[in-house]
């Protein structure tokens, strides 16, 4: 196939073909569910939603695994703060996550494993690492990974152990042989809830974060698979540690391709709660509709930084409106399977085949919209809708999208349009203008054409 992907591991563009012909296996690190999803989470899940959509559009079968971390220090603290069980908290936050990302048309993964369901596999993996001399039991009761014993440590980051130590300013701990060593099994501490503890050959405790993903990816996809993805913030140490664990245990490459989406910034500043510029998906959806937020994210390449601002959101809304305006002109023809030999479709495919180049693909959608405006072609409108569908866009009713935000009842608007038509027929143009201006003041734009008068929201 013609698809090329930027591989973080090699720091280069590479031709992609799946290990198993026709079948792509992809693992993405999902949410640690102690709070509502924010726009950074939306960006990550949207990026890999587009990836799996395009792989399927290219005729490939995709097994997409996106995990849920449902045991973690933050989860334990939040459950204690709220006076509820860990399971109550994680069930509540999982349901909220599904609701939020469902609104954004993010398709569910093929498999969504919860960490707490795979503790036996984690214990087995830790046992293998200990037998191979890659793990040791610390005086605290923890089991740690010995990074200096894994020859390839640092290959994803492209840095030596010394560079990683200096860059991360890792604190020296008495029970670690190296400051970069990380915990595989955390010994239970006094006062922790019973549901945060498991009996094990290493003592009562719970798994470390990194071992969770190694165990879940192996259990659901096998020892080696095609794509491992996540946010850029996970490249080190999380993904570096996953490689050390999985490859240390199996002796096989964990993933052929490593993909990382860029950070979200807010008004050109880092997004953080301390700066007061931290927004949940639900907060953003109080300002704009879900498809506008999706379009805002998708039109930026997944590896580039995404700058969130009210201005950029409104620009995205206006741009998406242009595409829906074209689809409102003529009923799109159901074209069935996309003909990739069509010049527009071919340019779209070329863009997406170059590391999922959504900015260039979106540009093709605007080219098509221009052609639909010019020709009123139902076939081209159908192609515009079909190509938009590859990105999870343009599947709604155009008139409904264009009329969002209008408070006036549709029947009342129709009555006023009829009154305006009667005024024009009676050559009472002052009254006709008054009706138009009155509707405009209420956020309604009238559009006259030989076929009659239609309306849409002004914004």
Curated annotation (Swiss-Prot):
**Motif 'HIGH' region: chain residues:** 31-41
Q: Which SUPFAM superfamilies match?
A: Anticodon-binding domain of a subclass of class I aminoacyl-tRNA synthetases, Nucleotidylyl transferase
Can the keyword Aminoacyl-tRNA synthetase be found in this entry's annotation? yes
Query: Which compartments is it annotated to reside in?
Result: Cytoplasm
Positions of Zn(2+) binding: 29, 213, 238, 242
Q: Which InterPro entries match?
A: Cys-tRNA-ligase (IPR015803), Cys-tRNA-synt_Ia_DALR (IPR015273), Cys-tRNA/MSH_ligase (IPR024909), Rossmann-like_a/b/a_fold (IPR014729), tRNA-synt_1_cat_dom (IPR032678), tRNAsynth_Ia_anticodon-bd (IPR009080)
Q: Which Gene3D superfamilies match?
A: Cysteine-tRNA ligase, C-terminal anti-codon recognition domain (1.20.120.1910), HUPs (3.40.50.620)
Query: So which cofactors does this thing need?
Result: Zn(2+)
Q: Which residues does the annotation say bind ATP?
A: 273
Q: Which UniProt keywords apply?
A: Aminoacyl-tRNA synthetase, ATP-binding, Cytoplasm, Ligase, Metal-binding, Nucleotide-binding, Protein biosynthesis, Zinc
- Which biological processes are named by the entry's GO terms? cysteinyl-tRNA aminoacylation
As recorded in UniProt, its EC number(s) are: 6.1.1.16
Q: Where mainly found?
A: cytoplasm
- Entry note: cofactor: Binds 1 zinc ion per subunit.
Q: Give start-end ranges for motif 'KMSKS' region.
A: 270-274
Q: Which Pfam families match?
A: DALR_2, tRNA-synt_1e
Assigned GO CC terms: cytosol
Which reactions is this enzyme annotated as catalysing?
tRNA(Cys) + L-cysteine + ATP = L-cysteinyl-tRNA(Cys) + AMP + diphosphate
Gene Ontology molecular function:
ATP binding; cysteine-tRNA ligase activity; zinc ion binding
- How the protein assembles, per its UniProt entry? Monomer.
Similarity comment text for this entry: Belongs to the class-I aminoacyl-tRNA synthetase family.
Task: From the Swiss-Prot or TrEMBL record, give the protein name.
Answer: Cysteine--tRNA ligase
